């Protein structure tokens, strides 16, 4: 059993223990008869005899200690819920307003087209025309990327840019000799076609992706490049990517980064990828656009962006102290006074994790790394001299505290622990505005920026309820720097040619797994707990009726606990 499963099992056992005590105390479960028979050897009717004293003791303890303690948690969650809904409303409102007024980066930052067109035309015009283009390096970090290495290398080699002004650097950290050989042969094939493509390896994987990017910047040929674009192994930029991004950097000397938006080649493959699309579309449409439009802060997404080399060096270069090296560099560059540009209409194709396990590992890495970076950067942000106080508040409060800590905490503690337990603790008070109105408001503001994903938003809410368990565990691991806080597991890809031409049916068949090997114990445990609480609420009506929501949450945990969401074509999956 992994550490995460053990932690989930402990959480379930604690919640189940509280539920059992509450159920016994209210009379839903009565073991007095069994206690009396065993202790006295006599037949006594349930509910009578000497065993009733401990029930009364528990009721007293519940009203004097348990309920007050949980009530503190309730009000803490209410405060966090308000923080969360205000943050979401602000992001959605700003992004909608920016769209309505036609806000575009070109209005605030100078942009002029380069020359007369693409690389082929520049070759005809000669060296004089090509000299107008700055030296650009494109980095493609990869690790055992058998399924996608050709896609990314081919797409990057198709970028429109003078060949003599472009260096393509494939940073291969693969440990599989067969895959390394294939990647190297692919690079040699493109080099034979006249492209300046470099195949770079290193001994060991120190620093993981950050270490590879840092090592790549140390090569002599890299030092002559003014700008560096980064694409993960599953990303496929359009040919005009550099033509649309680099001019912003050339004409605005205070701009360090131009970030593009992600789109997905496998978003219709399964319910899992559809829900991921809903989440990421909101991130790009609301959070990234709001941070860009207000000149506050938005983070580098780790790929599909172009950096000014000077800014990378000024910020201290790539660091491997967390699993979110992209966010780390973005924050440090911002504190140095550099500005970022987000281009929401420039889209780069990529691949979503197609299995639940892969998605959980990706989200753990992102959540743990973000929380850990929050811990490491608090003082640096507070003492920074080149950013305003408002930007410091935005970075620490909005970007880090609310999104990295508050969001997973309130989602799990309130909706998966406190509300279920409350159906068996009548002394607990839950304000209706906190458990009904705020979730509804969050649903609405999310739907406003996701109209094309409206049908998946309710499912996304249930899915996020499950994922909050993993994100909260990751946030705690990052904040406390537990043993697993700096683990890096590469997200498994399958390649978009693993699906049919309509991007709907998986063609790659996976070997059949035994049911026991597919079970996720924390999810199954929480599903049992939630369904028990829902059934208790249905049978023994209290002052609140949460059983419908609890049944839905329990079903969501159960399906994900059996890995029934994702691309497992051999099984009954959605």
Swiss-Prot record:
Topology versus the membrane: Multi-pass membrane protein
Record keywords, A-Z: Cell wall biogenesis/degradation, Glycosyltransferase, Golgi apparatus, Membrane, Transferase, Transmembrane, Transmembrane helix
Subcellular location: Golgi apparatus membrane
Main location: Golgi
Binding site for substrate: 232, 234
One GO MF term: glucomannan 4-beta-mannosyltransferase activity
Superkingdom: Eukaryota
Keyword presence, Disulfide bond: no
InterPro entries named among the record's database cross-references: Glyco_trans_2-like, Nucleotide-diphossugar_trans
Catalytic center residues: 173, 326
A single BP term in Gene Ontology: cell wall organization
Keyword Cell wall biogenesis/degradation: yes
Cellular component GO terms held in the UniProt record: Golgi apparatus; Golgi membrane
Family assignment from sequence similarity: Belongs to the glycosyltransferase 2 family. Plant cellulose synthase-like A subfamily.
Purpose: Probable mannan synthase which consists of a 4-beta-mannosyltransferase activity on mannan using GDP-mannose. The beta-1,4-mannan product is the backbone for galactomannan synthesis by galactomannan galactosyltransferase. Galactomannan is a noncellulosic polysaccharides of plant cell wall.
Protein name: Probable glucomannan 4-beta-mannosyltransferase 5
The organism's taxonomic lineage, starting at the top: Eukaryota, Viridiplantae, Streptophyta, Embryophyta, Tracheophyta
